[in-house]
Regions:
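Short, basic/hydrophobic alpha-helical segments
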Residues: 94-114
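Extended, low-complexity cationic-aromatic segments
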Residues: 15-98
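Short glycine-/polar-rich loops that comprise or flank the Walker A/P-loop
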Residues: 29-30, 80, 110-112, 140-145
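Short, aromatic/basic amphipathic alpha-helical patches
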Residues: 126-137
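Acidic/histidine-rich, metal-coordinating catalytic segments
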Residues: 111-124, 149
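Short Lys/Arg-enriched helix C-cap and helix-to-coil transition segments
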Residues: 1-15
């Protein structure tokens, strides 16, 4: 099928690297954190919701006013049960750089922060350098051991 990705040797090797990182025992000095982001639509109620009353559930109208969009960055440290979220106006290299700064600040005693994230174009050292300067970017990036998740390539096949 044209929409099924091929799992080639490079994909499998990168996947195994991520899984091996997840299998390591917890070490506070080397936290394993995962980062991702999601665009969201902001809504406002057209009518005020009705609060719950004895014997009646709260009610909220299904109509809403669209109030633009935003972005949510989520950072999860699964083995410690910690998570951080950050709402930003958009998903940009500047926002990513600021989230990485906040991440490193949140782990002042970590020797190395293992960061698992996808291959989005802003998920790179250049985003930090462009917006925070070479010196701060070098410091922040040196605190990270980045592990990118594997990227699937679509299978090349003909459609009949």
């Amino acid at each position: 099928m044209w929409c099924v990705a091929e799992l080639d040797d490079a994909y499998i090797a990168q996947m195994e690297d991520v899984l091996a990182l997840y299998e390591k025992p917890y070490k506070a000095a080397e936290p394993v954190v995962c980062l991702d982001e999601k665009p969201i639509v902001l809504h406002a109620d057209l009518r005020p919701p009705r609060p719950a009353q004895p014997g009646h559930l709260a009610k909220r109208d299904n109509e809403y006013k669209r109030c633009g969009t935003a972005n949510i960055f989520a950072i999860v440290e699964p083995k410690a049960g910690r998570h951080f979220t950050c709402a930003t106006p958009d998903r940009s290299a500047l926002q990513f750089a600021q989230v990485i700064r906040d991440l490193v600040t949140a782990y002042p005693f970590a020797r190395t922060i293992h960061l698992v994230m996808d291959n989005l174009n802003i998920h790179c050292r250049k985003s930090l350098t462009d917006h925070l300067g070479e010196r701060e970017a070098n410091y922040l990036w040196s605190r990270l051991q980045v592990q990118y998740t594997p990227k699937r390539q679509l299978a090349q096949s003909s459609r009949d």
